[in-house]
Amino acid sequence: MNHYKPRLLLYCQHSLGMGHWVRAMTLTNALSREFRVTFLNGGRAPDHQAAVADLDMLNLPPLGMGEDHQLYSQDERYSVEEALAARKQIILDEYAMLRPKVVLIELFPFGRKKLAGELLPLLKTARRDKQTKPLVLCSLRDIMVNARKDQSRHDERARWITDRYFDGLLVHADPRFARLEDSFKPRHPLQTPLLYTGFVAPGRIPAAIKPPRHGVLVSAGGGMVGAPLFQAAIQAHAINWTTEKLPMTIVAGPFLPEADWQDLVAQVKGMAGLTLRRSVPAMQPLLEAHSLSVSQCGYNTVMDILESGTPALVVPFVRGQEDEQSQRAQKLAELGLVEILNPSELTGQRLAERILQLRDFSPNPAGLNLAGADHTVRLIQELRASKNDLIPGAQSTEYVHVC
């Protein structure tokens, strides 16, 4: 029997990669069991989109962010200014039509400040809605970028917006691994309830028959900045194949620029033991079929590594102020969960050596909470039931923390 599901409006903007998209879709899959979800997608939609019941996908005029940290339009029909104006109106119109019970915004105001022009009007509208009185929540990953030149000012601004417009922060991490205050240090204490959900992992996909693990799997999330890793991997494979006959599969990712993809295709043509794939709908089954993993260290890649238990060498992506992956990699290495190769040392020869050494690495049991998607649903339900309380009394103190 069908039962009434309250409306939930989820906003997600991915820019450089697709990590935010993947995590938000994993959350959506869990949330759709209890809510009718409208997903406002602000970036380019990936080719592979798993079907989710009770999901309405609304693709906004897509925007990305370049290496200069400036917005650019991913639809030639719109300039950046035109896209921003259209997006703002679409978002407000969608809210007015849906009158959602829950508004869930990914990352903002801890990031995406260039999109404040479309998000602050939404937040103000939700706060003025005295009839629906929606629960307004922020969805955050485990580690924030904290190397900005104006970091103190940025953190204080984020704190002020959060305390003014949000009912709660959902941090998708195990607090034993990372806490928000490690990378977020406003001048004044945050008053908004902060709740740790555990990590949002896709959940293991049981296989009827598990073949023996064999070979190296190389990946870089969406692939947008994966070309240097893939080039080094091809060189490493050529070095190791002559003596070890260790097969390699490279999954380039849907966002690897087409020119880089064609370059890879040309390079691997005729190479024995090397398989090149553009993208796959799910990485975890492929990880579980391989004996070793070489990858960057994005949130979702790490979730797949931890769930699969595959011995992993991570080469964290670092660019300018973005040190999130390096921080995550260091924490994982300290727990004995991965091995690290510093990106400054990435060469074909060095990677070939580290791949062979990785065969002797046995990762420790993760011991981390990876059930964050289901826990997020429970937390939202409890927050709705106790919206007038500062901190829901039903929450376990292990997962509730006020900065």
Predicted features and spans:
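Conserved nucleotide-sugar phosphate-binding/catalytic loop shared by glycosyltransferases and other
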Residues: 3-9, 14, 30-82, 86-88, ...
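A donor-sugar binding/catalytic signature common to diverse glycosyltransferases
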Residues: 18, 44, 282-326
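Short amphipathic alpha-helix
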Residues: 20-31
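Donor-nucleotide binding loops and adjacent catalytic segments primarily
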Residues: 28, 184, 199-292, 326, ...
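Conserved nucleotide-sugar donor-interacting segment of glycosyltransferase catalytic cores
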Residues: 92-163
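A nucleotide-sugar donor-handling region in carbohydrate enzymes
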Residues: 139-228, 253-258
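C-terminal amphipathic helix plus adjacent low-complexity
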Residues: 353-403
